[in-house]
C-alpha cells in the first residue's frame, strides 16, 4: 500500500536539441510536465522569456486527427472482419514504426483524403435523396392533376391549389365558394387519411372572395409554381435523380470497401498524428528564450536514474529535488503488488489519496473481495465469473483500467465460489429441482457451513460482524495516521476510547456466552470509554461549556456507529437475493415436468435465469461493495483529493511502441 515517492524536476536545455529531446522524453514516459504558469507570470523572468507559440501547429494536427478519424469511421462501416471484444494494440519496435510510417505516409494520406471525400459525397447524396423524396411526397396528392404546375395563372385567371381537413363536405364547400366567386371551378384532386386536396380555377379579381369563403374550412394554400411540368412528370424526374444518386452511392461504397484493406495503415497514421499533437502541446507548455527552453515537472523517484541519463546525454542543466512537504500540487501514483493492483480501480473511482495519505487499496482489497463474494454467493456463478474473466485476460489481453477491472472480477469470482460452497449455492437449487423433476429423487448439495435461506438471522449476524471488523480496521488506520503525524493523544482519545466503548457494549450485551466475567469487563470498558469520550471529545473547544457540549456531541456519535454497522445488512439482502432469484427461475423451468418439453423449458429458463441473475446481482455486488468502502470505511479515515500522475507518454489507440530502437517519427 504505497504512494510512490515523487521528485521535482527542473530542466534548461538548448532550443536546437529540443525536438529530439522531446521524442526521447515521450519514449521514457515517466515525466509529467507542468504548464509553468508561475514562471511565465513572474515579473523577474518576464522580460527575457516567452511561451512558444505553436497553437497553429496543434490546431492543424487536431484537424488532421479529426480527418483521419472520419476516414476510419467511413471505412469501418464496410469492414466485414469480425471485431474482437477487447481489441489489442499492435506491438511495434519504435524504429520499425518510424520506417513503416516513412514508407506508407504519403499513400495513406491520399487514402484518407479519398475516404473522407467519398464519405462526404455519400452523405451529400443521401441528403439530396431525402430532399427529393420529400418533394415527391409533396407532389403525390397532385399526381392526377394534368395541369402543368408552373402555369398557376393566365392573363385573366389563376389556379389555386390547397388542402382542407378530410371531414370537409366538398359539395357544401363548392356551393359556398361559388356563391362568393361565381366563376370558380372546384376539383377534388385526391384525399388521404388527414386531408382532401383541391384545385380551384377562378378569375383573378375573385381571388380574395375565394380565399375568404374558404377560411371557415381551415383551407391551407399550396404553392407548386416552382415545379416544371405536371406533378406526374416532376415526380418521374425526381425518381430518376434518386436512381442516379443511389447508383453513385453504390459506386462510392465500393471505393470505401476497397479502402478497408488500408485500414491498419490509417490507424497507424492516426496514432502517429496523436503523438505529434501531444509533442506539440508539450512544447507549448515550455517557456523559452532565444537560445534555451525551460520546464518544471514531476517524476517518480525510482525513474530518476533513467531521466538523469537522458539529461546527461543531451548535456542539459537540470535539478532534481524532493518536493516541499506543503506542496499540494505534487501528483500521486500508486504502486501495489499484482494481487492488490486490480483493486486500485475501486480507489480511483472515489479519489486518489493525497501525497501524505495512506494508499487504502491494500486495506480495502480483502474486504471488497469478501463482500462481493458474500453478496453474489453462488459457487457455480463464481466459477463462471472467474473462468470468463481468465479467458478474457489470456485471449484478449486488455490493458490499463480494463485489465485491472477484469482481473478484480476474476478474484471476486473466487470469493463468490468460496461463499457459495459455504452456503450450498450451486445455480441456486438447480440440481435439487432437476433430480426431483426428471428422476423423482431427492438430491441436495449440503452447505459446508449453513444455508442462508434457512437461517437468515445467522447470515445477518455474520454480515454485522464483518461490518464491525471493517469499521474497526478503518478506525485503526486513522489511529495509525495520527500517531505517524505526531498526534498520539488524538489516536488515544478519538479512536482508543471508542474501541473501549464499542467493544465494551458488545461484551456487555453478548458476553454472557463467554462467562459472567466477560459481562462485567464489558460494563467497565463501556463506562470508561463513555466517560473518557465525554471528558475529551470537546478538548479542542474553548471554555468549560464548550468542552462539555463537545464531549456530549462526540458521545452522541455512537448513533452514527450503530447506523454504519446496520448498513452492512445489505450483505444479507443481496446474499439472499441471488439464491431466491435462482430458485424462482429453477421452479419456473420445472413447471412443465419431465419429458422432452420439460427438458427444453428447463434448459431455456435455466440459461436465461443464470445470465440474468449473474448480470443483475454481480452489478449489485459491485455497486454495494463500493458503497461500503466509500461511505462507511473511508468515512473513518480517508479524505482523498490526490491529483493523478499524468506523465508525458505515448497515448496511442492502435499501436504499442516497444522501448527499443530509435524514434524518428516526424
Where are these regions (language model features)?
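Long, charged N-terminal accessory/stalk domains
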Residues: 1-364, 392, 399-402, 406
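Conserved, carboxylate-rich catalytic/transport cores that coordinate ions
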Residues: 2-7, 19-22, 26-33, 305-666
